[in-house]
Amino acid sequence: MKEFQRMLMLQYSKHGECILKEIGAAFRGEHPADLTIVCENKVKLHAHKLVLAAASPLIRNLLEDTHLSDCSTTVYFPDVNATYFKFLLDFLYSGQTCITSRDVNYLHDLLLLLQIKSDSWKTTDSAYLSSKCGGLRDRADRRKQQYTSPQNLEPDQTLKYEVDSVDESRNAADFSSAFNSNDNCESAAECERSGGHNNKEEDEDDCTHKDNKSDKDTDEIVNLSNAPPSGTSGSNSNISTSSNHQQQQHHHHHHHNHNNNNNNNNNNSSSSTINPVNLSLDLRTKSENSASRTLGSGSDHSGIDLAVTASESTKRKGLFFDSHKDVMKPLSDGSDINSSPENYVVTPHRKRRPGFHNTQSDNQPFTSYPHSLLEELRLAKSTTSPISGFGSEKNMLAHLEDGALNGDTLTPDRKHLLEAQRNRAQSPEIPMHLGPQFVYQWQSNQNAAMSAMPNLQSRLSSLSHISLNLDHPEGRSGSASGSGANLAGSNTHASSVREYRCEYCGKQFGMSWNLKTHLRVHTGEKPFACRLCVAMFKQKAHLLKHLCSVHRNVITTTNGADTENRYSCCFCSMCFESVQELVRHLSGHHNNLLLTKNLRE
């Protein structure tokens, strides 16, 4: 019969971690670089083909097209500044980089040059978008100086624009053209109020068009402080009157947060060119797109402010850092630690040995039993006392003596039993003669003093043996002594003394063969051997288990595909239906063949 080799699946659980460590080691210069990049002014940067080819399709195509025998390859980028390429290498090797907001556009252009898709990265700071919208901010300042004056400008009114789903590849001219689409309105706030449902529908269409265009968008908020709240043009005079009530509502809504908004907006406008931007590899989910469309399609943008961004940042930090209250909170007590599911210790089940199907509860622990003479005397008195032997029967007849039951309802047998119990004569005291086997042989050192006590035999012999009878002294004495013997036997079994003690470790055993098997642990004796592979074992059960597992192909007999397997003996021609029957056969008929001393026969 042809045997097919089994296929094994090998899995390396730390594969990803090792790859990241190797990439970090390559970035630190521990591995020799095989790719040289020549940037502007002939500045050379060293990198690795594996990392750049995995990130940039352009580099991968160049390496595939040029089959060079040389180990090192040089790629020229004469129009790329080396500083930005260093930022890109840091970004590709470590997964994130920190740059100023003014360099985002150059880094983005470099990513586009290397054909790295921009939908796999996003920014965590809105300052770079404010720098890209510098033309928009300058235009708003010019419109403020042209159409407003210090007399009609209220200090607590701010204008907030929300640029939703803005593409990073768009330049400042795109924002200027988008702003020029509303030139029919003199003021941006008037445009928001006068647009009505038409502007809302146009904004929704624009957002839908931008979201369907690509997934490369990021949601950013641009705050322009001290912008004109209303216009002075005559073409919009009829609209300003009708929207006066709406303007008051907006003023009331922004009244509580105008100080914080002004401060944050001034800080953003003043430090927009020096704030660092953290670029991290992160895929944008569809839920963020839906949330941005929901926020961008509404006509009232007053509820979107920096507090929302701060709360979201706090929530994100809460996922990774514990609060100070939780850190300083002490443990209540030890019960919480012990009762937690993580502290449960799972012990494996003991494997069943072939032929020995004893349960875990049958194995009593090896604990020494402290014996005392007083307990033995108390036990002997309780087993021979008439009260203990027939206490239950006397309690059963107690309510009859008190007259709880009517005498007419008793049967003749019960009446006879009651009279015999009431008029029972005192049994004569007969001295009990104890044989030498009744006296315990004290083996332990702690009971040596008790075994040396004088008159121990006379004290035990002084106990009286009382014959208990109800009807006939001769007939009931046998049953009483039998019940007393049963009680004594059960109590003796419950408090059995482990008389066999190991001289190496001090463990005590109740059976001699248990001690004999235990001594093999210390002596190293292996009296059982396998005749098929000459393996030796300390216990016969271990040898039988070895035969049924390692040499299973030897003892298994196959008669066909439709019939069940049979188990044949390796020492004779007998076959069995189950492994248990074979184990009993080997342990009984061929017990001598399992011994090490008979291995040469």
UniProtKB/Swiss-Prot annotation:
Per UniProt, subcellular location reads as: Nucleus
**Bias kind Basic and acidic residues: ranges:** 190-200, 207-216
For this record, the Gene Ontology CC terms, alphabetical, are:
nucleoplasm; nucleus
Q: Which GO terms describe its molecular function?
A: DNA binding; DNA-binding transcription factor activity; RNA polymerase II cis-regulatory region sequence-specific DNA binding; zinc ion binding
Keywords attached to this Swiss-Prot or TrEMBL record, sorted alphabetically, are: Developmental protein, DNA-binding, Metal-binding, Nucleus, Repeat, Repressor, Transcription, Transcription regulation, Zinc, Zinc-finger
Residue spans with biased composition (Basic residues)?
Answer: 248-258
Q: Where is this region: Disordered?
A: 188-276, 331-365, 471-491
Major localization class:
nucleus
Q: Gene3D superfamilies of this UniProt entry? A: Classic Zinc Finger, Potassium Channel Kv1.1, Chain A
Recorded phenotype for the gene knockout or disruption: Flies show low mating success and reduced copulation duration. Men and female genitalia often remain inside the body, and genitalia and analia are missing in some homozygous flies. These flies are named after the famous dolls who also lack these 'features'.
Comp. bias regions, Low complexity:
235-247, 259-275, 476-490
Q: Does the keyword Cytoplasm apply?
A: no
What tissues harbor this protein? Expressed from stage 5 in two rather faint stripes at positions of 64% (anterior domain; AD) and 17% (posterior domain; PD) egg length. During early gastrulation, at stage 6, these two stripes become more evident and detectable at the region posterior to the cephalic furrow and in the hindgut primordium. The AD disappears as gastrulation proceeds, while the PD remains. At stage 15, the AD appears again in the foregut, and PD expression in the hindgut and anal pad. In imaginal disks, it is ubiquitously expressed in both males and females in genital and eye-antennal disks.
Functional note: Transcription factor required for terminalia development. Negative regulator of the JAK/STAT pathway: represses JAK/STAT-dependent expression of ventral veins lacking (vvl) in the posterior spiracles.
Protein name stated in the entry: Transcription factor Ken
Gene source species:
Drosophila melanogaster
Please spell out the taxonomic lineage of the organism that makes this protein.
Answer: Eukaryota, Metazoa, Ecdysozoa, Arthropoda, Hexapoda
